[in-house]
Amino acid sequence: MIWAYRILFLPVFILSIPYILWHAKRRGGYKKDFHHKFGNVPYREPSSSQSKRIWIQAVSVGEIRAIKPLIEALSAKPEVELVLTTTTSTGYKIAHETYENHVAGIYYFPLDFVPFTKKAWRRIRPDFCLLMEGELWPEHIHQAKRNKVPIALINARLSDSTYRLYQRLGGLTRSIFKSLDLILASSDSNATRFLDLGTRQENTKPVGNIKCDVPAPPPLGDGEAIALRKELGLPAASDKNQTLILCGASTWKGEERSLITICEALQKNGIDLRLIITPRHVERRKDIEAELQNTSLKYHIRSRGSATEDVQIVIADTTGELTKFIQLSDLVFVGRSLPPHTGGQTPIEAGMLGKPTLFGPGMANFRDIARSLLNADIATQVEDEEALRITVEELCADPEKRQAKGRNAQAWLVANQGATQRTLEAIQKFM
C-alpha cells in the first residue's frame, strides 16, 4: 500500500506547489528553517541505552499548546529526550516560545515523501514516536515500522469528513492503522470510530481529551484588564458601566459580518455590546475592515498599536492573544460554526476560562466536546445569525445566567481532567 501512496504523492504535491507558495506568502510563514521540510534537520547522535528519544509531532498552534502538560511531564524524566516537530509557521513560533527549555530540538515536520522522511529519520533517530489527534502520515508511519520504532496516536479523534474519507479508502487506511502500536482516543465515540475502521481492540483506548489538562492562564489582574481595555479602545468596567464584550473566537468568512450586524442591532436596542473579532486567519483583516467601513461603528485594528479613541469593535489580528481577549469578554462565540461552515473550532478554551459559549450548528470536528458543553449548560447552540442575535441579547440581559454558566464551566473542567496522566501510563511500556 505504501507504494500506491508514494506514486500518488508526487503529482499531487507538484500540482499543489503554486497554492503552497501563495498560501505561505499570504500568511507570511516559513521565512526561517523551511529546509527542515525536506528532511534537512540537524543530525542527532543515537540515544544511549539508558535513554529514550521521543519524536512528538503536533501540527499547529492548538496541538502545540495542548501537549504542554505532557511535554513537561516527559521532559522531567532524566531518561527521556524530546524532539518536537510542527507543520505550520505559527506552530513553529509558539513551539520555540514555549518549549525551548524542555526539548532537545524543534523543527518543521518533513513533507511526507520518502526521500524527505527518510532523511529526517536518519538525522533524528527516535526510539518512540507520538502523533497528535488525527495525523496519519503514511510515509512517517512506514519509516517507524521499517526502523522498528513504536508509534502511537494520542488525543486521537476523527471528524465526520475524515471518518467518511477513511471509510472510502478502505484497505489503505486499515494498513496504516495496523501499523500503529497504540491509539489513545479523546472520547468513547472516537475510539468506536477507530475500531470501526479496523484498529485493534487491544491497542485502542479512550483516555479523554488532554486539552482539558492545559493549565488555565492566571486571571487578568484589575490593572492588566484596565490597561488592555484602554489599548483596545474599550471602556473600563465598573458598576455603573454596563458595557459587555462579545469575543468572536477564530471566526471565518461571513461570520464577522454576522457578528457586526448583531453588534449594530444591540447597540440600537440600547445594549452597549462591544465586539472583539479574532479571525482564524489574521491576513483577512482587510476583508473585515471593508465590512466595517459600511457601518457607522468605530473600530480599531490591534496590530496598529493602541487605540486613540473609544470604539465598538476591535479586529484582533495578532497571534497568541486569544486567551487574553476571551478573559476580557463576557460571552464567546466559537467560529467556523455558522452556515455555510460545518467544522467548527475548539470550544475548550472558552469553556476552561469559565465563559458562556455560543456556536452554530456546524461543530462536526468537535462534536463530543460541543455536546459535553451543551449537556453541562455552559454552551448554547444556535441555528443561524438571527438565533445568535436573540441568544446574545438574552444573555446580555441576564447576568445571573451568565454567572451560572461560568460556574458550570469550572465544574465541567475539573470533571474532565486526567487524560494526560492516563496517556503517560499507557505509553510507559514503550519507554
Q: Residues of each region from the PLM?
A:
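Nucleotide-activated sugar donor-binding and catalytic core shared by glycosyltransferases
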Residues: 1-431
